[in-house]
Amino acid sequence: MGAYRYMQKLWRKKQSDVMRFLLRVRCWQYRQLSALHRAPRPTRPDKARRLGYKAKQGYVIYRVRVRRGGRKRPVPKGATYGKPVHHGVNQIKFARSLQSVAEERAGRHCGGLRVLSSYWVGEDSTYKFFEVILVDIFHKAIRRNPDTQWITKAVHKHREMRGLTSAGKKSRGLGKGHKFHLTIGGSRRAAWRRRNTLQLHRYR
């Protein structure tokens, strides 16, 4: 087995003495830093490489801190208007994952870079920490490589804002297997429309 396989096994056993100590120390370290900062190198090189990261020019790692918990509706003094069914303020759950929120914040901060993917690096009772892989699409090492040319296309501008990253697709219910059967046909809306449209085919 290679070194990355051993690292993968270590990260899978998060309750082991080694990982509990490491995660505790790292969470303390991340709390002292700003909510969004550049990391000198990936904390999990095995995971980063699986998601497409390469240790060469053009790739950047940003670490993002996201506050845990639900999303309170931003209304003044709880004044919501309309029917009582829409009066909720406190127990509202956000439609997307905290990981996709972290990607969005990194993408906003680094507008000239493209978000490739992200991964979890730690959490405590208040925060979750993610590392986001960003790509400089104007770097020659990215533009001239056939494997990475796809992300330089204009259609991938701010892909994290439109649910095109891995975390974003998961929140949209897109994927393979029986867990994702509600989005057969492209999206939840497309699947619903197809199931609820009456088609009377002409008898021939």
UniProtKB/Swiss-Prot annotation:
InterPro entries: Rbsml_eL15_core_dom_sf, Ribosomal_eL15, Ribosomal_eL15_CS, Ribosomal_uL23/eL15/eS24_sf. GO terms for cellular component: cytosolic large ribosomal subunit. SUPFAM superfamilies: Ribosomal proteins S24e, L23 and L15e (SSF54189). Pfam families: Ribosomal_L15e. One of its GO terms (biological process) is cytoplasmic translation. It comes from the Eukaryota. Keywords: Cytoplasm, Ribonucleoprotein, Ribosomal protein. GO terms for molecular function: RNA binding; structural constituent of ribosome. It is found in: Cytoplasm. SMART domains: Ribosomal_L15e. PANTHER family: LARGE RIBOSOMAL SUBUNIT PROTEIN EL15, RIBOSOMAL PROTEIN L15. Belongs to the eukaryotic ribosomal protein eL15 family. Component of the large ribosomal subunit. The ribosome is a large ribonucleoprotein complex responsible for the synthesis of proteins in the cell. Component of the large ribosomal subunit. This is Large ribosomal subunit protein eL15.
